[in-house]
Regions:
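Zinc-dependent metalloendopeptidases
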Residues: 28-263
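Secretory targeting and sorting signals
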Residues: 1-30
């Protein structure tokens, strides 16, 4: 989805999304400002937004498969019965895409961040359900090095450790030919809801090479930490060109999204 929204529209829409997802957890006192309108490159992703009666908001980011346009993916999702598929310039879709902090071509995913819990940095565990061809543990190494947030790996049978730690379930499978990867979550008050964040990696369209699968895993895991897309092909958060690692701009966004307490 192209970032063509004007700042005034973005600010109004961000307020609308926050109002629809009334806080059920701590209020986000460092919420991002409005959507970015000056990012390099085009974002062809498709966003889904579903405000819910319990005050949470379900959101998802789909990355179109090769040869599939964003409009074609939207049509496919709607035919499959997915509600809340956002058009390119729809208010709710613009309202969750590409917020500050913005560093270079990297941005945060508006209203999607982890609570600190009892720690100085949020603790996020990726629980791996994926097949052997997906190097989730290697991709996690990159995100563990990011400042501001600690990312850990666990095989799914070990379970979520609890105690204020957060978990993201990572799956792989044959999900059709319309998209590479999907990150979905529920939020409340600008924070991820524990137990709701899921990554899905598509065996059916992602080339079965280490580079391609590490890139897609890195991309979706970055969303699960609170990042939106990056306009530079030096980052795995870009439109898939199969770069395998985050960029320094991605790390800088996380460092600002999760400042040390008291700073």
């Amino acid at each position: 989805m192209l970032r063509r929204a004007r700042t005034a529209i973005g600010l109004a829409v961000t307020a609308l999304v926050v109002a629809l997802s009334a806080p059920a957890v701590q209020a986000d006192t460092t919420a991002p400002t409005g959507p970015s309108s000056d990012r390099a490159g085009a974002d062809s992703a498709v966003y889904v937004v579903q405000p819910r009666s319990d005050g949470t908001t379900y959101t998802a980011i789909y990355e179109p498969a090769p040869g599939v346009t964003a409009d074609e993916l939207r049509s496919t999702l709607r035919r499959q019965g997915v509600r809340g598929v956002q058009d390119e310039n729809s208010a709710l879709g613009i309202g969750i895409a590409g917020c500050s902090p913005i560093v270079g071509t990297a941005t945060a995913w508006c209203g999607h961040k982890w609570a600190y819990g009892p720690f100085n940095d949020p603790q996020v565990y990726f629980l791996d359900h994926s097949g052997d061809s997906w190097p989730v543990t290697d991709a996690r190494v990159d995100w563990y090095q990011a400042p501001g947030i600690d990312a850990y790996y666990r095989w799914h049978t070990a379970g979520c450790p609890g105690g204020g730690r957060h978990c993201v379930h990572v799956y792989s499978g044959n999900y059709g030919t319309a998209w590479y990867g999907l990150t979905e979550a529920s939020t409340s008050g600008g924070y991820f809801v524990d137990g709701s964040v899921t990554v899905k990696l598509n065996d059916q369209v992602t080339p079965n090479t280490y580079a391609a699968r590490r890139s897609v895993a890195c991309h979706e895991m970055g969303h699960a930490l609170g990042l939106d897309h990056n306009g530079s092909t030096n980052s795995c958060l870009s439109v898939p060109e199969f770069p395998q690692h985050p960029s320094s701009d991605d790390f800088a966004v996380l460092n600002q999204l999760y400042p040390k307490p008291g700073t």
